[in-house]
Design a protein with these regions (language model features):
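Glycine-anchored, exposed beta-strand/edge motif detector
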Residues: 16-161
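Beta-strand-rich receptor-binding modules of extracellular spikes/adhesins
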Residues: 1-14
């Protein structure tokens, strides 16, 4: 209730709802998160995947870069705050994230995809599905506001031939 955290050393059973709140405040998020080690410098809002070294990297749908997603290595979520290379980074696996500076203006209700390429050096979800041969298509979530997304990765990854 005070904004802190509670640790449960055993199983927790919930008999009611778990409510995720949406916020208009820049940088706010709510949902299921996990802490990983960053394999490169990352910015809030960037889509990431787990690399073979166990660290998270920018996830791209182009099929050729070191961070390229594929059926065996999909994007897992979105970074909630900037992180330096080789540092702890919080990844939103499912939930809401508002980011005014790093997100473009999204169309409310639109499906968001793992980006084919970085935009202004940022690897944020994009409105257009990749469409080139060798690219991979993966839904990463949905736009619920011009600068707020619902992260809900679909782990189905389709390759364009």
């Amino acid at each position: 209730a005070d904004g802190g955290s509670t640790t449960f050393p055993q199983q927790l059973t919930i008999t009611k709802n778990i409510a995720l709140t949406q916020s208009d405040s820049d940088g706010d998020y709510s949902g299921v998160t996990a802490v990983f080690t960053s394999g490169e410098a990352l910015e809030a809002g960037e889509v990431v995947s787990i690399h073979t070294d166990g660290e998270v990297y920018k996830a791209l749908a182009d099929g050729t870069t070191s961070g390229a997603i594929n059926a065996d290595q999909p994007a897992i979520g979105v970074v909630v705050a900037d992180a330096a290379d080789d540092s702890d980074v919080i990844v939103l696996l499912q939930g809401f994230l508002t980011h005014n500076a790093n997100f473009p203006t999204y169309t409310v209700g639109a499906t968001l995809y793992v980006p084919e390429a970085e935009t202004s050096s940022k690897c944020v979800p994009e409105l257009d599905a990749p469409d080139s041969s060798g690219d991979f298509i993966q839904v990463i979530g949905y736009a619920v506001h011009a600068n707020r997304i619902f992260v809900n990765p679909d782990f189905t990854v389709i390759e364009i031939t």
